[in-house]
Amino acid sequence: MIRRLSVAFLSTYRGPQADAPGVTSTGPLAVAAHDDLVSDDLVAAHYRLASMRAPGETKAAVYPGDAGSGAALQIVTDQAPMLVDSVTVLLHRHGIAYTAIMNPVFRVRRGLDGELLDVRPAAEAAPGDGADECWILVPITAAADGEALTEATRLVPGILAEARQIGLDSGAMIAALHGLANDLATDLEGHFPNAERKEVAALLRWLADGHFVLLGYQQCVVGDGNAEVDPASRLGVLRLRNDVLPPLTDSDDLLVLAQATMPSYLRYGAYPYIVVVRESPGASRVIEHRFVGLFTVAAMNANALEIPLISRRVEEALAMAHRDPSHPGQLLRDIIQTIPRPELFALSSKQLLEMALAVVDLGSRRRTLLFLRADHLAHFVSCLVYLPRDRYTTAVRLEMQDILVRELGGAGIDYSARVSESPWAVVHFTVRLPEGTAADSVDTSLENESRIQDLLTEATRNWGDRMISAAAAASISPAALEHYAHAFPEDYKQAFAPQDAIADISLIEALQDDSVKLVLADTAEDRVWKLTWYLGGHSASLSELLPMLQSMGVVVLEERPFTLRRTDGLPVWIYQFKISPHPSIPHAPDAEAQRDTAQRFADAVTAIWHGRVEIDRFNELVMRAGLTWQQVVVLRAYAKYLRQAGFPYSQSHIESVLNENPHTTRSLIDLFEALFDPSQETDGRRDAQGAAAAVAADIDALVSLDTDRVLRAFANLIEATLRTNYFVARPDSARARNVLAFKLNPLVIKELPLPRPKFEIFVYSPRVEGVHLRFGFVARGGLRWSDRREDFRTEILGLVKAQAVKNAVIVPVGAKGGFVVKRPPTLTGDAAADREATRAEGVECYRLFISGLLDVTDNVDKATGAVVTPPEVVRRDGEDAYLVVAADKGTATFSDIANEVAKSYGFWLGDAFASGGSIGYDHKAMGITAKGAWESVKRHFREMGVDTQTQDFTVVGIGDMSGDVFGNGMLLSKHIRLVAAFDHRDIFLDPNPDAGRSWDERKRLFDLPRSSWADYDKSLISEGGGVYSRQQKSIPISPQVRTALGLDADVEELTPPALIKAILKAPVDLLWNGGIGTYIKAETEADADVGDRANDQIRVCGNQVRAKVIGEGGNLGVTALGRIEFDLAGGRINTDALDNSAGVDCSDHEVNIKILIDSAVTAGKVTPEERTELLLSMTDEVGELVLADNRDQNDLMGTSRANAASLLSVHARMIKDLVDNRGLNRELEALPSEKEIRRRADAGIGLTSPELATLMAHVKLALKDDVLASDLPDQEVFASRLPYYFPTRLREELHGEIRSHQLRREIITTMLVNDLVDTAGISYAYRITEDVGVGPVDAVRSYVAINAIFGIGDVWRRIRAAGDAGVPTSVTDRMTLDLRRLVDRAGRWLLNYRPQPLAVGAEINRFGAKVAALTPRMSEWLRGDDKAIVSKEAGDFASHGVPEDLAYHIATGLYQYSLLDVIDIADIVDREPDEVADTYFALMDHLGADALLTAVSRLSRDDRWHSLARLAIRDDIYGSLRALCFDVLAVGEPDENGEEKIAEWETTNSSRVTRARRTLTEIYKDGEQDLATLSVAARQIRSMTRTSGTGTTG
């Protein structure tokens, strides 16, 4: 039973009415979803409630709730209409929220005493079987008021009884209404003596026709203010009520409409109307027919012209209006239709017209119209209000209700509203008057109506109206005011007074698209500020804005956003914040300080919004230290630099230190401004000293060592700053684009790691950061787009070390720059679009970075040559105008962009600023980098006896044919057999290539734009080969590939990384690197040490590489330790810096040539049009000049390798000297430790080729520094070589301009040093300075003199030509080393025997021509063993293809050295040089001096002391020969030959000569020619002399 009842209840489930209390959803819902509403206990309780009920009785109870259900109202009553409506209205009126209502109708059988016998759903019962009952169940929400529910439950029986009675009497009431209408229509008895009776009859029929819900009826006899009800007439609710209303009207009107004082329970908020019809059956007797009911919706919306009785009054009103043509008839008709229908019953035609005309007169005026009408019984006052439609809001309506209740003394109020398309809203208020109110106490006079109307008008005046009034004095147009009256959102209007909006409008009107304005104001609350943030064009989320504010050191207490559109449609967002500063931030002491703080705060947050300031705690300094945001940026930039420098403290810690020490922080800024503010330049030094002292005093007072270190680091950085663009105000500067640049002196920055460059520029902005490191005034190197945001300086420092070494061969020293993009574009998923967006941002950051560099770089006035300091830059260093850049990783195509930036600055270098641009030397077209590296390859192979240009050889490579270095390199010989190669996309395998056909195909790919290995013609690949993607899971390995790569026989497939490793370890002749990345390391290195994670999977160790030679066209392909390991394992390799130096060399030539040509353009000697043609016409010769440097260096490296073991001790001392005096770091440069050098000495090996290359570079760099610091480049004897740096055409056409070149000193120096080191060897200058005790510059002087005197350069070139002609490298190396011995000995001679400092030009004049004349006659003077030795040596050279004259010249090299003594002696004794030569060489032969000298050469030189001892003996022997020559010449005659002179001398000095010869004979016979015996021999020769032999002539 219970379950059946539950199903019946649930089948009628419906939600609450939409306007019921607590409604969240309405309407019927799925039954299954509400099983939990009806528990068995609940249904059982309902069943118990229904178990006993008398007919007509209503049972109601409240179920208190259980574990399954909440509280519920339970009702059992007879079935009748309108039961549920009555219950829901009752609950609504008592404010009781319910969750559902269920009202199943059951067919019930009961016993005589009302006990329940049977119950079943009525639909299932047979007709006539029992009575229908409605069981109503209303689940109540838990929040419902218990007392209200109890009261509602008490009222239920009575209310439902009325509903039931209405249903029972419904027909009778309608019949009574029709009956009365008939009586009125016929009036047979004359009871209705009124002209309107037929209209009233029609009205009653209209009411009965669905326009009036009848609730009750009664007849009353009225008279003398009393009413008596006829009991038999009572129907509906009036049947159940005994109270009797007094007469409802005192007028003679036939029909009166009154309103009940109690609301109905049949409709929410509805008060029933009473339709009263007066019948007069006798002279003094009046009967009121009272029909109580509710107008239906149809009635309330009915056309007034279709309602009987009312329609006539309306027509009469309109007719009256027609008499005046000015009255708008249709408008009047429309207005009348807006009057609530019940009110029409109370209005006459005249009143209707007056009301309508008043509304017409209201027009578009923004005011309110009120019509008052009091009930004659003083029960209520009807208030009809017309107001502008847009002014009708809930808030306005509620305020109107308050006014009307207050002003009319009401006890309550009801309303109904009508809002249509007309300009007005119509609200009908009914003010309920307190019971007992006297009719004459209700004031509805015109005066009171007007007064209340004014109050209502004020109530309807909205915020916008008040704002417009408040703006009377503001200069804002009426149209704008009208716009903003509607534009401001409601929440804004609730938050702000209208007058506050006037200031906002002014700010809003000043906004631009994507602009911002902030206003900070104090509030009445302590330490609480109001911040208003205005945004034009773009909104922002709270998650965007809060971090900005929090970074300023404030807490956001409250946030309110508002949105509106400006008059021009620009969307504007207003955010109002309540903020409070951190408790540790001091409050501004006075109003002026508060205003200043507010302005700085607003400016700072504005800058943050625009991206000019980063979001971090540095921003707190605006309030803590009283700084501007620009000053904060200075400190932030220094902090960023410290982090890049490897400072051990985090940025967070640095922020905390500065914030906790605001006074010191302020002092740091004072110091910075004192140093660099151009407006303080006159007394800036004094201010700076004071500021520095203040900073020092602040720091000295600190207790914390960490804090001390942080603040001292900032002070150190500021004092190490040489220049800044902070004060630059030019609109085209980097500073104007929010870029800050510091030029620093790294040598005095204590926190910097080694090595420290000479100059450094740090560029900072929120968008880009970068550094540019320079190791000298004239320096060059590439700019890299780095992806290492956290440590890009570390990356650049590593690169600049290699660049410094690479630049050893060119004019500028090493430099390197790099930048990071800090705000890359958000990825969209569209790869092409993302790439383009990323590139565009990179280009813009590159521009900003270069602009930052140029902001602090001097310029040169081309007309005068004067150096010009950038405006508004305080310079704390000397002139510094040389800044050039080059392409690097990520910036390969950016040269033109760099030159555009330089041009915008009017920079003196023009497009020489960045070489490789569209007007310049195209490195790829020239193939210059690859060709330079190929010189290294050719040299390595020549040493193995292989000619790469005529003999086939096998190669594996890194790169593809579209690349510059790889592509050009693999076309430099048609004998390349490329076995395998890979790039980032593909792997190429050709195990048995045909050299010729594969060269042709590689050429085709090289010429094919954007080609890859996938484009290679597969039909040309040998059997077993192919092209495979690196994305494949595995790659099959053919037998042919196994053989070519030296793989084990069981290898049948490899993953791409494993295959690439196999390629790198392949047993081939050459490994050619033309790619990007590091692929070979040392076994002792971890992959993490390499810093190239992308290639960790494929990297191999140097001792695993089986290629015989590695050619490094690309950079960093092998680690420094990896190169050494490969070399020690038997491989041949230099350094990448040496191999690929042709690129930078070519760029340097381009820069210097452009400087030269541009000077000619300025002078009018060359037109701008001719400039490009002139530049490009020299491409080939420039290439040859560059490659000559590569050949020279490779020849130097070859001979250095050949001599490495014997010179290890010298090299070790050189390294130590560079460490001690030049700041060289062995570990950084991968040079061996002293322990490793001892190990190699024991093993009989010297420095490896990479180590020699590094040592060579540092020797050149050191020598360049020394020469530049001297006056050598300014002397003609050195400067005369300057023109030969330039191509022939420039030498011919611009000879004068060459002499005045801006970098003439640097070019001369570079030429001098390259010539010296490449010709005389790496150790020449060091050994000379060590041996003789002179400076490096003296060594250069001696070399230049010797070079000119003996024609060393010409001889050297002839040796190289012999090598090119096929003479073995071992032979040409021997010849070169022999030539260097001449240079060594001759150089020392000049430094020992000639006045110092050496007058190079004079010495050349003194010796040059005579040496040239005497040298060809050497064969005339050499005798005995000397002649035999020379002949044998020359013959050996000639046997290897060396031209005989060259062979003989080299063989006599050490004898030519003696010509210096010969010529000097001849000058001293005034004898002919040929006579002296004959005597000198006769003495040498006679004494066997050459044998002794040869023995000396065989002495050990393992350490410095042995070397010095060797040198001393040799010098002693030569010195004795010189002295003896003087003695012999003194006793001989000019016409005697050498032997005759010697014989005569021996006769004269027989005793000394005899003793000496006896000792020498014993030494020769003994054969033990060690240091001791040779020392004795030298002493014996010296003992023969009678003079010193060391005299000099001027």
From Swiss-Prot:
UniProt-listed Enzyme Commission number(s): 1.4.1.2
Enzymatic reactions: L-glutamate + NAD(+) + H2O = 2-oxoglutarate + NH4(+) + NADH + H(+)
Active site residues of this protein: 816
Organism: Mycolicibacterium smegmatis (strain ATCC 700084 / mc(2)155)
Claim: Oxidoreductase is one of the keywords in the record: yes
Name recorded for this polypeptide: NAD-specific glutamate dehydrogenase
Regulation of this protein's activity per its record: Activity is inhibited by unphosphorylated GarA. Stimulated by manganese and magnesium.
Function description: Catalyzes the reversible conversion of L-glutamate to 2-oxoglutarate. Highly specific for NAD.
